[in-house]
């Protein structure tokens, strides 16, 4: 088998194990984690920038992105703030406790062992 095909298969195995771990350990989907991590990387990000980034990087429909954002907001995993100058503009960020949770999850992922 070619190296590239083998790498894709290995990546899929690792991704499948990560999805299972996120679901069983933290009750979040991989899609929710991707959105959470994009906010984590930016620290504070506008809704438009978040949607655009996910749409172009992950090739997700904006309606899917909106559903995921609503779900993680309802789970209180992110916070949002409306712009004082333009009420239509929303920014997503983490409270101290939310950031601690994401710190914990990302550290756990770094040491997560993948089985062959």
Curated annotation (Swiss-Prot):
Induction: Repressed by SarA and MgrA by binding to the sarV promoter region. GO terms for biological process: regulation of DNA-templated transcription. It is found in: Cytoplasm. Gene3D superfamilies: Winged helix-like DNA-binding domain superfamily/Winged helix DNA-binding domain (1.10.10.10). Residues 51-74 bind DNA. The keyword Transcription regulation applies. InterPro entries: SarA/Rot_dom, Transc_reg_Sar_Rot_HTH, WH-like_DNA-bd_sf, WH_DNA-bd_sf. SUPFAM superfamilies: Winged helix' DNA-binding domain. Keywords: Activator, Cytoplasm, DNA-binding, Transcription, Transcription regulation, Virulence. Its main location: cytoplasm. GO terms for cellular component: cytoplasm. Pfam families: Staph_reg_Sar_Rot. GO terms for molecular function: DNA binding. Transmembrane segments: none annotated. Part of the pathway by which MgrA and SarA control autolysis. Involved in regulation of virulence and autolysis genes such as hla, splA, aur, scp, lrgB, scdA and atl. May also act as an activator for the expression of regulatory genes agr, lytSR and ArlRS. NCBIfam families: Staph_reg_Sar. Belongs to the SarA family. This is HTH-type transcriptional regulator SarV.
């Amino acid at each position: 088998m070619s190296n590239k095909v083998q790498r894709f298969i290995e990546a899929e195995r690792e991704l499948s194990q990560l999805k299972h771990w996120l679901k069983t350990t933290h009750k979040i989907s991989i899609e929710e984690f991707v959105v959470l991590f994009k906010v984590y990387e930016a620290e504070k990000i506008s809704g438009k920038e978040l949607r655009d980034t996910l749409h172009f990087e992950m090739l997700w429909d904006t309606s899917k992105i909106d559903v995921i954002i609503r779900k993680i907001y309802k789970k209180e995993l992110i916070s949002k703030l409306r712009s004082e100058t333009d009420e239509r503009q929303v920014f997503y960020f983490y409270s101290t406790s939310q950031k601690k949770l994401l710190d914990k999850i990302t550290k756990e992922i770094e040491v997560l062992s993948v089985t062959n």
